[in-house]
UniProtKB/Swiss-Prot annotation:
This is Transcription factor HES-4-A. The keyword Nucleus applies. Keywords: Developmental protein, Differentiation, DNA-binding, Nucleus, Repressor, Transcription, Transcription regulation. InterPro entries: bHLH_dom, HES_HEY, HLH_DNA-bd_sf, Orange_dom. Induction: By Notch-signaling. Acts in a complex regulatory loop with other bHLH proteins. Residues 1-44, 262-281 are annotated as: Disordered. Shows a complex and dynamic expression pattern in developing embryos. In neurulae, expressed in the presumptive floor plate, the anterior part of the prechordal plate and in the anterior neural border. In tailbud embryos, expressed in various neuroectoderm derivatives and in the mesoderm, where expression is limited to the presomitic mesoderm (PSM) and pronephros. In the PSM, expressed in an anterior stripe prior to the formation of each somite. Expression in the presumptive neural crest is disputed. It is found in: Nucleus. It comes from Xenopus laevis (African clawed frog).
Amino acid sequence: MPADTMEKPTASPIAGAPANSAQTPDKPKSASEHRKSSKPIMEKRRRARINESLGQLKTLILDALKKDSSRHSKLEKADILEMTVKHLRNLQRVQMTAALTSDPSVLGKYRAGFNECTNEVTRFLSTCEGVNTEVRTRLLGHLSSCLGQIVAMNYQQPPSSQQPLHVQLPSSTPAPMPISCKVNPAEAISPKVFQGGFQLVPATDGQFAFLIPNPAYTSSPGPVIPLYANANVTSPGGRQSQSPVQGLTTFGHKMPHMAQAVSPLGGSTGADSAESVWRPW
């Protein structure tokens, strides 16, 4: 083959390829860049939570205040929060009043705590040099006035559902001393023994009487003193006289003034009254 017809060497396609054909991997994002990219998403979620909670709070506060939700459909967020704060303060006052009524010791604890706080404020104002004298005087005067109002507070006890029963304790004197007791009529159907040894006995005419052991006669076999449910009972003749509850008598030895008290109208003798009495045993 002649030399002029020889093929010229050609460049290889692989060798002629660019050198930057290989792609480099992406660099990982830093923590600050991640926070910046996720901040709008987190802000959107936070606002959604706030709006949802305010919507639920609006429904609850309108139901608690018994207001029509259709008339308050466009309440602002500030209005909802203000209504909630006022409602919670009212609930706190009611709970405090109920606690003071049911437990009087709570008022004493509150007074002690308020007095301690007043002393701390007084001590701080007396040692602090940057407080104006006028402001210090006004503040201490206000706290002293509030403390005086708290000390003067008197909470009335709730009225008792029990019905008062007036009974009399017979003695040697002609005018017995009335005693006021609290007895629930629903619980006085049958004889009951209470703490202290006294017994409540219902009579046949619907009245009640107490049997209280007399400590002056401890040597005798258990004498008791009857107490009368009604101090004055109108006799058939129209005059008023002391009338005992039927069926009451003394145990053991009889006493002279007790024998007179057992007589229904004061005209019968002690023997007649002893025969006509009703003995519960």
